Structure formats: C-alpha cells, structure tokens
Amino acid sequence: MSDLKKAAQRAIELMDLTTLNDDDTAEKVIELCKKAVTPAGHTAAICIYPRFIPIARKTLIELDAEDIQIATVTNFPHGNDDIAIAVLETRAAVAYGADEVDVVFPYRALMEGDETVGFELVKACKEACGDDVLLKVIIESGELKDPALIRKASEISIDAGADFIKTSTGKVPVNATLEAAEIMLTVIAEKNRAVGFKPAGGVRDAAAAAEFLGTAARILGEDWVTPRTFRFGASSLLSSLLHTLELADAPKGAQGY
C-alpha cells in the first residue's frame, strides 16, 4: 500500500464524520451514520447537533456499528462567554447520550484580554461531562490568528481539563492550518498530559491529511496518533479518501467542511 493510501486509511479510522448544517434532518443524519460504515472500516465518530443523537444512536445500533462514537457541539458556533448557557447545553448533550462534546471556547473574550472566562467555561463544561464523556474544546484558531493567542487558548483549555483541543468550528473563513496544528500540538507536548488534537475543516484530501498526521507524529510520536488522541473533523474528506483507496468514484467537488 502506498504512503498516500496508508494516510487515507488512517484518516478514515481517525475521522469524526460531520454534519452541522442548518438544514440537517433526521434523514440526513441516518445517511451520515450509513456513510460512517465505510468500505474501509468505521470512522471513529460522527459529529451532529444534539437533537439528532437519539436517532443516530438507534441507527448505529441497527447498523451493528456501536463502536462509532457520537460527538455533538455546544456553545456553537459563536463561542459566547455565557458560562451558564454553555454548561446547560453541555448537560443536555450528555443527557441525550453524547459520547463526546465539542464545545466552542469563548475566543472573542480572549481576544479582548479576558483569560478567566475561557478557563471557567471549559472547567465547568468538563465537570458537566464527567469522566465518561470526552470534552473537545474548539479554540477557533482561524479567528484568533495570532500565534500567541492560539497558544494561550490551547494552554487555558488544557489547564481547565479539556480532553482534546480542536482547531475550528468549520463556520469561519479560515479553519484547520498546519501552522495552528504546530502550535497546538507543541502545547500538548509541553503539558505532558493525555490530551488529543482535532484539526477540523479545510482538510480536503489524503495528501492534506498526511501532512497533519506527519506533524503530529513528529511532535508527539507515531504511537501517539490514535483515535483516543487524534481526530479529523470533516464532511467532504471521506469521499476523497475512499477515492484514493479506489473504493469510490472521484468526489463531485468538495462540499462543506
């Protein structure tokens, strides 16, 4: 198997296959669940809005694919600084049955100089998740822009108890970049804690996936790159990867994240 095909296979196993569109329906989520059961194996997770968790759980059971985790989003997509609302949304997501919660860090507050609200929000949301539900914190690196702010948001999130740090919501012009990945992965290495990394949005094909995988392996070691500590957040990437593996036709133009 070529290096590109190996990267494609790996990226599928590390993928949070995502639909977070305003026009999502139960039918679209059922289709997403079916797509997550790929000819190359199951994706690590699906990522959907909270209200669709019950139908997704039912569908994954019917597909005999209960190993696929269900991730959802809270404080999404704007990263507001209202801790109470973020916590209530996170509790509701856990009550719905989420295995993982991707919460948006209050990045605009950080840009305005407030480091406290981000820490308190992440800490409270992790408490709402408990030990059994992973908390991934979306720092929105493409809006923070400044490497110092990307580093600071990563440090605050990890110090507050994040299980993962994630680049992006996929709802802003700039999503995952290798520059942001380098900073975020370096912070994880410095913190020396079992914290994962999730590039999301903008990873379009196996070659791009390979670059992110290579960056993670260089900074944290080849053995570190597993579904417990590395995920790709993507919607259009899957069809490109299956094409690379010669398991599907070429995608008809990238749609979405």
Swiss-Prot record:
Superkingdom per UniProt: Bacteria
InterPro entries linked to this entry: Aldolase_TIM (IPR013785), DeoC (IPR011343), DeoC/FbaB/LacD_aldolase (IPR002915), DeoC_typeII (IPR023649)
* GO BP annotations, alphabetical order: 2-deoxyribose 1-phosphate catabolic process; carbohydrate catabolic process; deoxyribonucleotide catabolic process
Entry's EC annotation: 4.1.2.4
Pathway membership, UniProt: Carbohydrate degradation; 2-deoxy-D-ribose 1-phosphate degradation; D-glyceraldehyde 3-phosphate and acetaldehyde from 2-deoxy-alpha-D-ribose 1-phosphate: step 2/2
Asked if Membrane is a keyword of the record, the answer is no
* Gene Ontology terms: cellular component: cytoplasm
Cellular compartment(s): Cytoplasm
Any idea which residues are catalytic in this one? D102 (proton donor/acceptor), K166 (schiff-base intermediate with acetaldehyde), K198 (proton donor/acceptor)
Principal localization reads cytoplasm
* Catalytic EC class: lyase
Which reaction does this chain catalyze?
2-deoxy-D-ribose 5-phosphate = D-glyceraldehyde 3-phosphate + acetaldehyde
Q: Name one Pfam family in it.
A: DeoC
An example of a GO molecular function for this protein is:
deoxyribose-phosphate aldolase activity
Keywords for this protein: Cytoplasm, Lyase, Schiff base
Family affiliation: Belongs to the DeoC/FbaB aldolase family. DeoC type 2 subfamily.
Q: What does this protein do?
A: Catalyzes a reversible aldol reaction between acetaldehyde and D-glyceraldehyde 3-phosphate to generate 2-deoxy-D-ribose 5-phosphate.
Protein name, please?
Answer: Deoxyribose-phosphate aldolase
Q: What is the lineage of its organism?
A: Bacteria, Pseudomonadati, Pseudomonadota, Gammaproteobacteria, Alteromonadales
